[in-house]
Amino acid sequence: MNTSPATLPPAPARAPRLSAADWAQVALDVIAEQGVAAVAVEPLARRLGVTKGSFYWHFPSRDALLQAALERWEEVEQQQVFGSLEEEPDPRERLRRLFQLVGHETRPHAIYSELLKALEHPAVAPVIQRVSQRRLEYLTASFRQAGLSRNEAQNRARLTYAAYVGFLQLRPHQPKMTHEEFEEYLE
């Protein structure tokens, strides 16, 4: 049998090399689409076009993947939402831009909404608690910078955050708002 390089059959295409971040991102995609309970190794591997071995190369368990996905979401959410507002010196304009930002981004809302439904999960609850606390602190500080007293700022922050969570619950069941309608909503 001739096995010179010219006569060997082509090697089969290899699956892409995945990182732990790739697995965490696809887990977040599934959370957004189907919830925390839908995060399972075999379906994720099929979705990525790889074997379970790729998963176990990066994670010892589903819980470890879920933890990595939650950490990724927490970090990216912080950077995307609050990082983009750091350059705005006017606290009122910063709050307005924050409301516009959270009113138009759907993927982070979907993940957050699904995580709120899974608060009984031991990995989810502390992440939501940290994210909520950080958001409330940010809102309180912004309202303080806008001239409200500490107590007024805390109350306004809680009310604003509660309205945001309620907005997320109502949003999937309401007609989609146009940009102009959302701007009126903010006024």
Language model region names:
Residues 105, 118, 163:
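Conserved catalytic core of Hanks-type protein kinase domains
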Residues 1-18, 148:
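N-terminal intrinsically disordered/low-complexity leader segments
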Residues 68, 79-112, 157-160:
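Hydrophobic alpha-helical connector segments
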Residues 78, 105-109, 113, 122-147, ...:
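Amphipathic alpha-helical packing segments from all-alpha helical-bundle domains
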Residues 26-34, 80, 84, 114, ...:
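Solvent-exposed, amphipathic alpha-helical segments
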Residues 125, 129, 144-187:
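Hydrophobic/aromatic-rich alpha-helical bundle segments in the mid-to-C-terminal region
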Residues 62, 69, 73-77, 91, ...:
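Hydrophobic/aromatic residues within well-ordered alpha-helical segments
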Residues 22, 26-68:
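Helix-turn-helix
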